[in-house]
């Protein structure tokens, strides 16, 4: 990436994309400010909780782990420096109002 030490750059949104862009821009020397309208960062990687339940507000699966590996490697780090992954089985469970439920199993494709 070019030398951006003379540049001030605003990034709109503190989701995965915005935070990744800000990290790369800052690594190139830019003075970066990230703006986020919500009180939490993470974009769709949030959750809502209430009445004993937890809901993802976005992705429920860790897709394309190689992209996360490459991002952290670009900064001399590994994902495990920041978080642990645990395979869940079932992947998730869906509950209906009448008490029925369905489990979505953990299985690899291919």
Across the structure, where does each feature detected by a protein language model lie?
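Glycine-rich FAD pyrophosphate-binding loop
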Residues: 26-51
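N-terminal Rossmann-like FAD-binding beta1-loop-alpha1 element of flavoenzymes
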Residues: 4-34
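A secondary-structure boundary/capping signal
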Residues: 12-15, 37, 58, 64
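Dinucleotide-binding Rossmann-like beta1-alpha1 core, especially the glycine-rich loop
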Residues: 53-67, 78-110
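Beta-rich carbohydrate-recognition and catalytic domains
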Residues: 72
């Amino acid at each position: 990436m070019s030398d951006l030490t003379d540049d001030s750059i605003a990034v709109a949104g503190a989701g995965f994309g915005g935070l990744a862009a800000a990290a790369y821009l800052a690594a190139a020397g830019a003075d970066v400010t990230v703006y986020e309208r919500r009180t939490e960062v993470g974009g769709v990687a949030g959750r809502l909780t209430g009445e004993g339940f937890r809901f993802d507000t976005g992705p429920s699966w860790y897709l394309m782990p190689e992209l996360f590996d490459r991002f952290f490697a670009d900064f001399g780090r590994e994902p495990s420096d920041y978080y642990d992954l645990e395979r869940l089985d079932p992947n998730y469970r869906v509950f209906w109002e009448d008490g029925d439920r369905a489990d979505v199993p953990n299985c690899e494709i291919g």
